[in-house]
């Protein structure tokens, strides 16, 4: 004879089913959130206020700084070199940036062949890079248009083509540095201590 399941067994089954559904929903939310963040990082943001910063990018391999020499790009600039001073504009909600040489006003770009070039107009997506902060505290710059292609240089400061670069290569690792004599001009954020307003006591007048 088939015996009906007890009330306790039914409750246990319902509980297990509920736990399973919660885990599935949580997994879906995590995936959706990761996709949302990735999409926002790659998308243009015309709402947020753009930030413009001035600094140099020190190449780990060449031991020098990236230079924007008009249409030519190299990593042979000394500390404080006028062609190594870069204006970096934060472009999106995520970490997309446009990099312009302060002296030449040409933008650092990567063309469809993976070659680093300077362009006077930086509106093209070829001139947008995704900034990645690595575990070793270096920064890597991946092309926003050509995913997986990075800004990189040889030991002699010559540009590497995008298809030959990888995130874990030292050739694509850079360190942000303020131009010589400019570090002291960068003011840190100041926090203001807010005290509670004391209650104003009105003077009493004799009746």
Swiss-Prot record:
Recite the UniProt keywords alphabetically.
Disulfide bond, Glycoprotein, Growth factor, Secreted, Signal
**Chain positions carrying an annotated carbohydrate:** 39, 137
What terms describe the molecular function in GO for this protein?
fibroblast growth factor receptor binding; growth factor activity; type 1 fibroblast growth factor receptor binding; type 2 fibroblast growth factor receptor binding
Where can this protein be found? Secreted
> Where are the disulfide bridges?
109-127
InterPro entries named in the record: Fibroblast_GF_fam, IL1/FGF
Record GO biological process: angiogenesis; cell population proliferation; chondrocyte development; chondrocyte differentiation; endochondral ossification; ERK1 and ERK2 cascade; fibroblast growth factor receptor signaling pathway; intramembranous ossification
The record's listing under SUPFAM superfamilies reads: Cytokine (SSF50353)
What's the main place this protein lives? Answer: secreted
As for what it does, the entry says: Plays an important role in the regulation of cell proliferation, cell differentiation and cell migration. Required for normal ossification and bone development. Stimulates hepatic and intestinal proliferation.
**Assembly description:** Interacts with FGFR3 and FGFR4.
Name of the molecule in the record: Fibroblast growth factor 18
Q: In which organism is this protein found?
A: Mus musculus
Name of the gene this protein is made from: Fgf18
């Amino acid at each position: 004879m088939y015996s009906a399941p007890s009330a306790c067994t039914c409750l246990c089954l319902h509980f297990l089913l509920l736990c399973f559904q919660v885990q599935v929903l949580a997994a879906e939310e995590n995936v959706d959130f990761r996709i949302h963040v990735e999409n926002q990082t790659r998308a243009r943001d015309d709402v947020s206020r753009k930030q413009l910063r001035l600094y140099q990018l020190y190449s780990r391999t060449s031991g020098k700084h990236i230079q924007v020499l008009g249409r030519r790009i190299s990593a042979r600039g000394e500390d404080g070199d006028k062609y190594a001073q870069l204006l970096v504009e934060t472009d999106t909600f995520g970490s997309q940036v446009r990099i312009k040489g302060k002296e030449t006003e040409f933008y650092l770009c990567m063309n469809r062949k993976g070659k680093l070039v300077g362009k006077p107009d930086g509106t093209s997506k070829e001139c947008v890079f995704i900034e990645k902060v690595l575990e070793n505290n270096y920064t890597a710059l991946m092309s926003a248009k050509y995913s997986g292609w990075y800004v990189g240089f040889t030991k002699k400061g010559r540009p590497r083509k995008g298809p030959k670069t990888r995130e874990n290569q030292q050739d694509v690792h850079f360190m942000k540095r303020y131009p010589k004599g400019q570090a002291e001009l960068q003011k840190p954020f100041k926090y203001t201590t807010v005290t509670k307003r004391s209650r104003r006591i009105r003077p009493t007048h004799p009746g």
